[in-house]
Regions:
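Bacterial N-terminal signal peptides that target proteins for export
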Residues: 2-13
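C-terminal motif of bacterial Sec signal peptides marking the signal peptidase cleavage site
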Residues: 20-24
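N-terminal pre-ligand scaffold of iron-sulfur
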Residues: 26-100, 115-116, 131-148
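Short cysteine-rich clusters marking metal-coordination/redox-active sites
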Residues: 86, 106-107
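Hydrophobic transmembrane alpha-helices and their immediate loop junctions
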Residues: 102-104
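Non-globular, low-complexity intrinsically disordered regions
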Residues: 110-111
Length: 148
């Protein structure tokens, strides 16, 4: 009798765990912007990245990424780099720096707005932030390396 009780408990526990798996997977959805290898190195003097708060966007031909890259300078030594592909429709739409506010990037397709400090969604239909790349700055040479 005790053996039967243990078996029922084990089966109930297994069913409970299996019911939790789809919920847990839903939390970790894959980012819609495809992963592409990025290795881009440039001298910031040649672009509009002279001071904190400045931003520059590169085409995919210049920099790589899936749809190009936007670089934002946070401070004298800290930069952020994001793919220009919009998470709403990465195959057809790309974000651009807002000409009135270089802290923002906008997508004309879904009208989403993203903060270039960290790539988060400010407004719009986007469900994911911008895909971020690693930005490493060498102040001795004024070179910025963007990788993933």
């Amino acid at each position: 009798m005790n053996y039967l009780h243990t078996q029922r408990y084990n089966i109930s526990f297994i069913i409970f765990v299996l019911m939790l798996i789809p919920t847990a997977c839903d939390e970790d959805r894959e980012h819609p912007v495809p992963y592409v290898h990025v290795r881009f190195d440039f001298n910031i003097i040649h672009y509009n990245l002279a001071g904190p708060g400045s931003s520059h966007q590169f085409s995919v031909d210049e920099s790589g990424g899936y749809r190009g890259i936007i670089v934002h300078r946070l401070s004298m030594d800290e930069f952020r780099a994001f793919d220009r592909a919009c998470p709403c429709d990465p195959h057809n739409c790309k974000v651009s720096i807002d000409p009135d506010n270089q802290l923002l990037a906008t997508d004309p397709c879904c009208e989403s707005v993203f903060l270039l400090i960290d790539g988060t969604i400010v407004e719009g239909d986007a469900q994911f932030p911008l895909r971020e790349y690693q930005a490493t700055f060498n102040p001795a040479t004024n070179r910025l390396r963007i990788t993933n």
